[in-house]
């Protein structure tokens, strides 16, 4: 049996990080990941023990989730200490942009560390499209090189499926992009879409896609039995 790949999830306190930790914990090739949080994140431990934060059942095995590990502060040395070979970033766009650049300049990626980024930091290669994120890279050349090297992580399509296994940096697609691409790809391949008439995608998602930060807009009383449009002219 092949040795399990040691993984880590940075941003394990968020919805994406929680779900990712659950999937990794049940995967036969990975097992429970190292759970990490940024030092700027605060974790409430009231009502829990052994360093397992209350309200985060994936860190204590509650809720039938097979991950039992406290969330630790992130550091590059912690990754090396635990022998992590694959790091998942469930962090904001700007944070992912900064961290991957640090990993490259610090030599971790050249020493074998691979990164899968769940944000939009590395998805778009065309500069005019990346402009919507307003990135301000401290190391512009390294960031540009990483942008070119990043592989779009949609394995259902070629050549992505062939590139992902050996990629040092994988840019995980967003939810809307995934749903639209997977629906359109076979239709386009079969020549069933009239591109001259354009394509309109009417997409909707659950409110959890907005993240766990509480706002009046995402409060239960605002979203229950309701529907609203957001970022109509600036969605990324």
Task: Give residue ranges: language-model regions.
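N-terminal Rossmann-like NAD(P) cofactor-binding subdomain of oxidoreductases
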Residues: 2-232
